UniProtKB/Swiss-Prot annotation:
Protein name listed in UniProt: High frequency lysogenization protein HflD homolog
InterPro entries: HflD, HflD-like_sf
Family, per entry: Belongs to the HflD family.
Cellular compartments per GO CC: cytoplasm; plasma membrane
Keyword Cytoplasm set for record: yes
Subcellular location: Cytoplasm; Cell inner membrane
Topological type in the membrane: Peripheral membrane protein
Coiled coil segments of this chain: 79-126
Primary site of residence: cytoplasm
One Pfam family linked to the record: DUF489
Annotated gene: hflD
Keywords: Cell inner membrane, Cell membrane, Coiled coil, Cytoplasm, Membrane
Gene3D superfamilies on file: HflD-like (1.10.3890.10)
Alphabetized PANTHER family for the sequence: HIGH FREQUENCY LYSOGENIZATION PROTEIN HFLD (PTHR38100:SF1)
Amino acid sequence: MAKNYYDITLALAGICQSARLVQQLAHQGHCDADALHVSLNSIIDMNPSSTLAVFGGSEANLRVGLETLLGVLNASSCQGLNAELTRYTLSLMVLERKLSSAKGALDTLGNRINGLQRQLEHFDLQSETLMSAMAAIYVDVISPLGPRIQVTGSPAVLQSPQVQAKVRATLLAGIRAAVLWHQVGGGRLQLMFSRNRLTTQAKQILAHLTPEL
């Protein structure tokens, strides 16, 4: 069966968007609020009608992820910030495979996310309550699968409990995107052998988004 590179690219952009947001949070203590909302909201939607629906039904919601994906795919340098993004992206893919192969882990994750949906009736998605709840899911369900993702940034920024919770919640969104990526036919070999195909697809999607003013 021919692979749907549109869906694969969207899901991959979802992983990369989380990686970029984690990087922004770790270095600056804040990140693109709209992109964060899209990524966190993707955790909640357990029964989406399409790949795009996971990210709010609009390609523009993945602009940060698509731009990051192009940077990761075409990185001529394995140093600095691009290296961080590549490391976060690949680490999320590795953890997703461990999650999918760990007995009962996906069921546990699903049950915990159902709990988030109940909390959303009383609290905003980006409230400290929801951030802490999502961070706790990451710590309880994902972290024990190992290896842990080493987040690098400003030590002063990373000491903040609020930033730590946001980083973990955003990593959980990255795991969600990685699960989706695998479901639509994604695989790590594509990063080596289908790089041009993924690059072309990402550029095509970005080309018909309205430019940011």
